[in-house]
Amino acid sequence: TLIYENQKTITITLKEDQKELKDVVVIGYGTTTKKDATGSLQSITTKDFNKGSIVSADQLLTGKAPGVRITNNGGQPDSAPNIRIRGGASLNANSSPLIVIDGIPVDNTTPAGVSNPLSLINPNDIESFTILKDASAAAIYGSRASNGVIIITTKKGSSGAPEFNYSSNVTTGKVGKKIDMMNGKQFTNFIQTYHPSLTNSLGIDDPSTAVIDDLSTPEVEGRILSNTDWQDAIYRTSISTDHNFSAKANLYGKIPFRASVGYTRNEGLVKTNDYERLSYSLKMTPKVFSDHLKIDANAKGIFTNKNAIDEGGALGGAINMDPTKPIRDNSSTNRFGGYYQDFVLDGSGNPTNTISGQYNPVALLMQRTRPERAVRFLGNIEFDYKMHFLPELRAVVNLGLDASEAQIKERFSNNAMATYRVINSGADYVFNPGKNYEENQTMTNTTLDSYLVYTKSLNGFLTKFDIQGGYSYQNFKNDGNKEIYRYNETTGVREVLPNDNNPNNRYYNVLNLQSFFGRANFDLTNKYLLTLSLRADGSSLFREDKRWGYCPAAALAWKL
């Protein structure tokens, strides 16, 4: 202990200084703070996102938002999720929420070959999600928001020093739990015990002997029995990689921008099920005219490529296929590329195209290809102008384009059982490989939103209010052709299935949506909040006298 003279005691008291952070959240056609929000909404930002190998945006949200249930109904890397906000217990009903990306409502109808609309945006470009859960919060988007709204905001540029970021991860996956099935020996014992007359159908014929099974012996004579785990035969340990690079800076000290590029390769748990995605994005947010005009320009592009499998046939076959049958049959009489097929013989002992059991699930995967490719561009530019003569008044115009092209080509290999058909003579069976299905599609979604916002702070009973009104226009076009190929018993070849009502096999449809909307927010004595909104939606789907519908809403809140 050190003691020095003239020691004094000094008492220091820290004065409490409360500063409330403005927790800004994005809502329909604007922003607010959480404390001023009247509707039920939730904001989820990057710090809350799920980590790991993320293929689509919905995987960032899974399990993160109370009242939001996200389930997958397929094993493919880009399988479409079922998203339900506050209920909607049906897994199959069309109860999907409206998706809004940087102010542009996107169509839940995906391009051909794309299962999940949220897989067409790079998850690494997302800054936040705002989920509008109740009717009052979502009503500003009208009838399409009846199942809730998910607003996606992408990352912005930097106003400071340049920043560069690269991230990469490699993940592996495997089937957590297979269905418990009998192995070859157990299945053989089952047949011997309960269906002894069928023992000569087990396995495959032993070409080295003409003996048939003697039911009085415990062994199965004259048959070669395998012990095939068909689930192991179609599943694999998957390896997936994800690479992302981004750069953000402030060009000339006036134009914050962010650019990114990403590459994802995802192997499905089922063999031959592969998915690739290449993405890019560019965002600029300059301010001009003494910060009176804010510009938000976005451009995002996605290229996807996947091989879609016959998931139902392969998975079902792996459960139902006889475990005493082999995967491969390399005998000289095999006609199916070395894959075993359990076919029915004709009167001459030749194989027909009729399956007596299940298609070989491995052959279903290996002898069929279905490349599905899609290209998508999503861009918009928003002008937010604060009037020089009246700073409380803002005019906002948002122009957007969502355009995509897609192509699907399904083909069978030369010895695929699925192409094995009898020719017109009824005596000979031949293979008819080649095209089975082809589709080309173009989709566009053009958007225009324009509205005025007046905001004013006052002293007295009415503390603050803002009023806005505007017009929204969206036009959807879907143009494509779909060709289905079938075996022609007269010509003996695969050719396009004729359609007298649509000789060109083309489909084309246009949907036009126009809306007027308004909203008023009132802050009374800085304690009570009142929100009133109304939207009128007009759709070209309905006849002229029934085209318009109205969505009014009101909400009242009390600040605690």
Regions from the PLM with identified roles:
Residues 254-257, 291-295, 390-393, 460, ...:
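Repeated loop/turn-to-beta-strand initiation elements of outer-membrane beta-barrel proteins
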Residues 159-226, 269-273, 279-378, 396, ...:
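Surface-exposed loop/interface segments of Gram-negative outer-membrane beta-barrel transport/assembly proteins
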Residues 81, 148, 162, 168, ...:
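Hydrophobic, lipid-facing positions within transmembrane beta-strands of outer-membrane proteins
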Residues 544-549:
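Short glycine/threonine-rich loop-to-helix capping motif typified by GTGT followed
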Residues 398, 470, 519-521, 533:
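Exposed, low-structure sequence patches enriched in small/polar residues
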Residues 154-156, 249-251, 282, 286-288, ...:
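Residue-level signature of outer-membrane beta-barrel architecture
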Residues 168, 261-265, 530-542, 560:
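Transmembrane beta-strand segments that form the barrel wall of outer-membrane beta-barrel proteins
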